[in-house]
């Protein structure tokens, strides 16, 4: 997102002998690469999320160029036509039995489900293609602006072979991969490797800062000694500049370790259907809003995110998808692309002040110590929750109020309808203020989050917000609420996402 750094990087790479092409769109990128391949009918490539993003493999094959993936996991997926399951282990969802069947179906002979046999066969098959190819395509984990060098990491050793093809090495990466210098890039490499595999460093770190060359004979420069005659850098924008300008720059700071997926509750259920091409999970779904279009973001699971923000906790560079997801949902709503069910919920809130469209009469009670905000679920669906909470408040002999509450607005905010939330919040706060109480307790974690986080700018009353479990625990510790002695209870605690 730093224009000066980008400009510095381009200049330095060009000074080092790279040919640099800036691709505004994915079509610009694939058209340019096809032109560079020329008459060649076979290219080998390494694993690259940017090439997945621009659809390079499919585009080249459509135009008569055979493309062979040289990462074993990606090669297996190429044969099976499946989606990747993880950025560093694309075929990790497949068992050895499934991979044996894929090889058997692809090559017309039976393979034993032995990982060593399968790996050795894959290695030999890939190596044969590499030796025949004159053009290699790789991605890049980092571009170093100060040195004009591309950093590419791998464990299999395939990238060194791919980038040493005789004719051309084409590096395809994106404008968010630029680092100030090689030291910063190596820090990223160590971080990525540790969070991806638990190892302190990857097996190979390839650093390319120019073409293969020698001047050993009378200082006469000769290019293409043991490596390619040309190194070409394709810098893909494809919506990133727009994303940076709109305040989504951090969304593209991802280093590709995949650690966020391990703690994502949605990914555990939906798997590799959640996300966009090589960019899996909530971040990928959000990024596809810019890399593709708003409709793609919907298809890739923009509304799947539970907003738990486990991804931010797990991320070594502190990328959290929840806030970005909610902002993009608002853009979806403003563009008129909301789901019919979401529109119905919004209409219900407008008409009845609750998402269910329920017109049941609410119990109202005056009190000046505590306001019990029941929430729509406890008021209209799980009424036993409200009844049980009220019983405990009665036992405490506390002066509690039950206001004529309206929806907290959480469901509206989560579905991209921000405008109505402020109206609901204002109405709730006015009713709470009238009671004179300084503590508000909630049964619903979503309602509690709404009051504490989603509209703190409206909270000028110095109110204390507590979940009912927190409030009653306080009273137990104070000795005001006593549990029956000797009673054995089995308790399940559901730790909420909010």
Predicted regions: what they are:
Residues 1-102, 291-459:
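Iron-sulfur-cluster electron-transfer modules
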Residues 1-246:
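The feature marks the mature, well-folded catalytic cores of soluble enzymes
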Residues 19, 23, 195-205, 261-277, ...:
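Flexible, glycine/charged-enriched surface loops at secondary-structure junctions
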Residues 75, 168-178, 238-241, 460-487:
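Short, flexible loop segments at boundaries between secondary-structure elements
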Residues 164, 178, 403, 491-498:
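Redox- and metal-dependent alpha/beta enzyme cores, enriched for Fe-S-associated oxidoreductases
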Residues 249-268, 297-319, 496:
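Cysteine-centered iron-sulfur cluster-binding motifs in ferredoxin-type domains/subunits
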Residues 273-294:
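Flexible glycine/proline-rich, aromatic-decorated loop/lid segments
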Residues 369-373, 476-498:
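Basic- and aromatic-lined ligand-binding clefts that recognize polyanionic substrates
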């Amino acid at each position: 997102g730093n224009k000066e750094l980008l400009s510095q990087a381009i200049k330095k790479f060009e000074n080092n002998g790279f040919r640099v092409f800036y691709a505004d769109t994915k079509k610009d990128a694939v058209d340019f690469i096809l032109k560079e391949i020329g008459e060649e009918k076979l290219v080998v490539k390494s694993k690259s999320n940017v090439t997945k993003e621009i659809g390079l493999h499919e585009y080249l094959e459509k135009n008569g160029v055979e493309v062979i993936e040289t990462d074993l996991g990606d090669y297996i997926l190429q044969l099976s036509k499946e989606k990747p399951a993880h950025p560093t282990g694309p075929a990790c969802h497949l068992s050895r039995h499934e991979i044996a069947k894929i090889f058997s179906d692809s090559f017309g002979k039976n393979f034993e489900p032995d990982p060593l046999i399968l790996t050795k066969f894959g290695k030999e098959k890939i190596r044969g293609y590499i030796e025949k190819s004159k053009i290699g395509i790789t991605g890049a984990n980092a571009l170093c602006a100060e040195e004009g060098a591309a950093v590419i990491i791998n464990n299999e050793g395939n990238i060194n072979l791919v980038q040493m093809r005789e004719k051309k090495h084409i590096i395809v990466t994106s404008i968010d991969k630029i680092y100030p210098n090689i030291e910063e890039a190596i820090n990223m490499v160590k971080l990525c490797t540790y969070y991806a595999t638990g190892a302190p460093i990857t097996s190979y770190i390839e650093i390319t800062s120019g073409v293969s060359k020698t001047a050993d004979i009378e200082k006469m420069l000769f290019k293409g000694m043991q490596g390619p005659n040309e190194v070409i850098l394709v810098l893909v924008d494809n919506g990133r500049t727009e994303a940076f300008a709109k305040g989504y720059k951090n969304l593209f700071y991802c280093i590709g370790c995949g650690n966020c997926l391990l703690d994502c509750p949605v990914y555990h259920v939906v798997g590799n259907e959640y996300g966009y091409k090589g960019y899996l999970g909530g971040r990928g779904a959000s990024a596809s809003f810019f890399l593709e279009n708003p409709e793609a973001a919907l298809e890739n699971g923009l509304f799947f995110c539970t907003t738990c923000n486990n991804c931010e906790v797990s991320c070594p560079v502190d990328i959290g998808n929840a806030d970005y997801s909610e902002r993009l949902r608002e853009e979806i709503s403003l563009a008129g692309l909301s789901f019919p069910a979401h529109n119905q919920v919004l209409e219900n809130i407008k008409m009845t002040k609750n998402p269910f469209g329920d017109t049941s009469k609410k119990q109202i009670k005056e009190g000046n110590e505590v306001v019990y905000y029941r929430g729509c679920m406890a008021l209209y669906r799980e009424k036993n929750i409200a009844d049980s909470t009220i019983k405990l408040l009665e036992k405490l002999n506390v002066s509690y109020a039950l206001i004529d509450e309206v929806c907290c607005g959480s469901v509206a905010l989560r579905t991209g309808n921000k405008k109505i939330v402020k109206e609901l919040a204002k109405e709730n706060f006015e009713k709470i203020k009238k009671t004179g109480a300084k503590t508000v307790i909630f049964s619903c974690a979503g309602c509690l989050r709404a009051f504490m986080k989603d509209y703190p700018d409206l909270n000028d009353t110095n109110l204390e917000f507590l979940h009912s479990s927190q409030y009653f625990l306080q009273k137990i510790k104070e000795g005001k609420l006593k549990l029956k002695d000797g009673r054995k209870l089995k308790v399940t605690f559901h730790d909420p996402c909010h």
